[in-house]
């Protein structure tokens, strides 16, 4: 909602500072607009930023953003909700849900969630 409001007020660039969840929320608000999304990664995985080769160090990310390169990207939808990097179903979706509920972050926590479910 904040990203949509920013565009309605005339913003042509909206910056997301956070992880994949934050980036997804901000990017969702920019669909069908001419506004650009700037990403400064600060999450535990930063999958989309890594895919786009945006450095995970904030100062390095800002240097990349200052180059002003804008590129279009595709997105998908599931049940009306957009996604920009990954989408999972079945066991993968279950693990993602448990990971989100755990409050822990990082690749070890993700593996731990999967192993706990597998061993039950």
Language model segments and positions:
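Catalytic core of DAGKc-family lipid kinases
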Residues: 31-36, 40-120
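ATP/NTP phosphate-donor binding region
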Residues: 1-14, 24, 60-63
